[in-house]
Amino acid sequence: MFTPEMMESVKKVEATRASRLGMEPRRMTAEEKDQLLREFHPDYRAEAFEEIKVGPNKGQKANKELVHMLHSNSRLLKDHVDLSKIDYDVDVLVIGGGGAGASAAIEAHEAGADVMIVTKLRIGDANTMMAEGGIQAADKENDSPVQHYLDAFGGGHFAARPELLKKLVMEAPDAIKWLNELGVMFDKDADGTMITTHGGGTSRKRMHACKDYSGAEIMRTLRDEVINRGIPVVEFTSAVELIRDEKNQVAGAVLLNMETGDYLVARAKTVIIATGGAGRMHYQGFATSNHYGATADGLILGYRLGAPLLYQDTIQYHPTGVAYPAQIFGALVTEKVRSIGAMLVNSEGEAFMHPLETRDVSAASIIRECTARGK
């Protein structure tokens, strides 16, 4: 299965295993991390970025792949669709059938709204399904949302929007409770206590997992809840443009049935964009574990109507994935393997970094090892 070159490396890794057992690589200083990121992290490659020429983020920079999408013209011509002919009329239109979209639809339905999900693939075909390691929430006695906030704020180099990060950490325990009550089978002790583990850059064990298929289990539960509630789901139908009313408020979307090629009109009092990110656009040519649907569709829809993008100049490069064999190139290797003891080693069998550094530092360390150090 392995190439001769790989087998040589495997032998070196095996030969150094005994010396690594029980050792803990030192953590980098803040200065070392900053220098490492500047030299090796993809977000610092000036040649990979272009200036945005139009829209609310005009004058700012983003990865070239995203900028080209932001500069693109709509595929919709006025003679393609009759806006007076309404095909769907609902209170809430949710665009996107992943974890966020399903959750939004469930909550809207619980509040009594007439809600519909539209997704360009199938419900559940999303990055939520691809997640393996777990979801973090400070719900143990030795932890708190304040500590979670500090870990996350520092791990993000103090660039996070405080109000958004506060909402994340304060509501995370309730989100875990909600998912648990819906039926998500989190890992638990015999007495029912949830098992938690460390994640990269965390000072407390707050990672809640479902074995190594956390996202699939969460999506299974959400999908079942959507079906059990009878929430309509229009699959293989993409939103190609948002519609505004005479008050300039979003009032629905033009949809494209990807099987028939027909354009459809959905009218809604509220539109929720839950289409995920841009990870499948292969920024800077990197392989990706992102789902095929993560192609920035919703970002472009919102941007064309004046919604500014946040953090458009950065993207998370997950440190660990499959490089061989080619059939699963780019598949995710979850952070959880490092949280329970796995080390990152180079081709010489040397542990070159602490296994629980933050993801940006870990990714930059791996890139340095493979390029500058040639290991």
Indicate residue ranges for each PLM-predicted region.
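Extreme N-terminal leader/targeting segments of oxidoreductases
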Residues: M1-D91
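Conserved redox-cofactor binding core of oxidoreductases
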Residues: Y44-N63, M69, E181-D262, R267, ...
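N-terminal Rossmann-like FAD-binding beta1-loop-alpha1 element of flavoenzymes
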Residues: V92-I117
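Glycine-rich FAD pyrophosphate-binding loop
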Residues: H109-E132, E141
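Glycine-rich phosphate/pyrophosphate-binding loops
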Residues: D114-L121, A278-A287, D297-L299, Y303-G321
